[in-house]
A protein has these predicted regions:
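Membrane-water interface regions at transmembrane-helix termini and the short interhelical loops
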Residues: 29, 56, 67, 96-108, ...
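Hydrophobic alpha-helical segments and their helix-loop junctions in multi-pass secondary transporters
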Residues: 93-119, 125-129, 148-176
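Flexible loop linkers connecting adjacent transmembrane helices
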Residues: 1-2, 26, 32, 48-77, ...
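Loop-to-transmembrane helix boundary motifs in multi-pass membrane proteins
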Residues: 75-79, 114-119, 225-234, 242, ...
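Helix-loop-helix junctions that connect adjacent transmembrane segments
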Residues: 142-145, 151-203
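Membrane-helix boundary/coupling elements in multi-pass transport proteins
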Residues: 18-25, 43, 61, 88-101, ...
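Extracellular/periplasmic helix-exit of transmembrane alpha-helices
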Residues: 160-170, 224-261
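Membrane-interface "cap" regions at the ends of multi-pass membrane proteins
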Residues: 1-21, 188, 212-218
Length: 329
């Protein structure tokens, strides 16, 4: 068991990938419809989804997603979901190795290139997947969460200080994307914002925290509250991106460039570094828990206890070899 505040921080980082930042920025190109989807989507869809996923796991002894599905939909569906979820988790983990490594390489000297950071991030993933939650994740996640929240609060404060001109919700309720004919609001905007409003990936992460909880009373602040917090972060970045597009046009398609420009102009050098650390922390903390989820799902499937390091390695070695193969490919 972990303290509730720490469980909240870990859950928040587990579910907050690049969606509430990069996704919200790209979603802002579609106009103020992105604001409405982030608000209503996170409240009535994303948070409800995460809460149900977490509470179902909590009431069934911390079972992982495929086991819960099998309990209610039968053995065949469970077997399909086991395979699908493990493959999905390995793919997510592999994607969230290359992305953060590229961001770190852009902040460090040329000698520390992307390949170097890929190795560093991957070694961290191996350790975070193998060791118990309280050994690494429980210690560093709160620091990552503080960096991510500092970034969001800092941008929010500067929105009020700079008081940029933003379109009224109803005036901007049209597709403002430069390529609107090829990129309709539905479904492209929803896919772009992704976990800034709702994500099925979260259903694989909530059971991890359900195993660390001691009371159902903690379910609402942890599962529901973490998604609402993610929605707030997404809304802040959507507003900041709207200002950026208003001042600089919509030609820029690299969300990382937009993040860098906004944070350096509004938060200064030190604030910009902390903000970028928050951006890097978001995918890293989703990647390591993706691998961890895959390990626990396979362990449930094989009925293999995970107290000994040797048994963890039986599962992790093939899984990480598959991820390395994807990265090399």
């Amino acid at each position: 068991p972990l303290p509730t505040w720490k469980i909240f921080m870990i859950q928040f980082l587990n579910i907050a990938g690049l969606g509430p930042i990069f996704g919200a920025i790209m979603g802002a190109k579609f106009g103020s419809a992105s604001y409405l989807w982030i608000v209503f989507g996170s409240i009535f869809a994303g948070a409800v989804h995460d809460y149900f996923a977490g509470m179902l796991s909590l009431r069934n002894g911390g079972e992982s997603l495929p086991e819960i599905i099998g309990r209610y939909l039968g053995v065949t569906t469970k077997q399909v979901m086991r395979g699908f979820t493990v493959v999905l988790m390995i793919l997510v983990g592999a994607v969230f190795v290359a992305g953060p490594a590229g961001l770190l390489a852009s902040l460090t000297p040329e000698t520390l290139d992307t390949t170097f950071w890929i190795v560093v991030v991957f070694v961290y993933y191996v350790l975070a997947t193998l060791l118990p939650v309280d050994k690494i994740i429980g210690k560093i996640y709160p620091l990552f969460a503080i960096a991510l929240l500092f970034m969001a609060v800092g941008i929010l404060v500067m929105l009020y200080v700079n008081h940029p001109a933003l379109p009224e919700v109803w005036d901007g309720l049209r597709n403002t994307n430069p390529d609107a004919s090829a990129l309709p609001i539905f479904p492209i905007m929803f896919v772009s914002i992704a976990c800034g409003a709702i994500s099925g990936f979260h259903a694989t992460q909530s059971p991890l925290m359900a195993r660390c909880m001691t009371s159902e009373r903690h379910g609402r602040p942890v599962f529901y509250g973490a998604m609402i917090t993610e929605g707030i972060v997404a809304l802040i970045w959507a507003a900041a991106a709207t200002y950026f597009f208003h001042e600089n046009g919509m030609e820029e398609t690299n969300a990382a460039v937009i993040v860098d420009a906004i944070t350096k102009n509004w938060l200064g050098t030190v604030g910009g570094v902390l903000a970028v650390l928050g951006v890097i922390a978001a995918p890293i903390t989703s990647g390591d828990t993706a691998f961890r989820s895959a390990r626990l799902i396979v362990a449930d499937f094989l009925g293999m206890e995970q107290k000994s390091m040797r048994r963890r390695l039986y599962i992790c070695v093939p899984m990480f070899l598959a991820a390395i193969g994807l990265l090399l490919y």
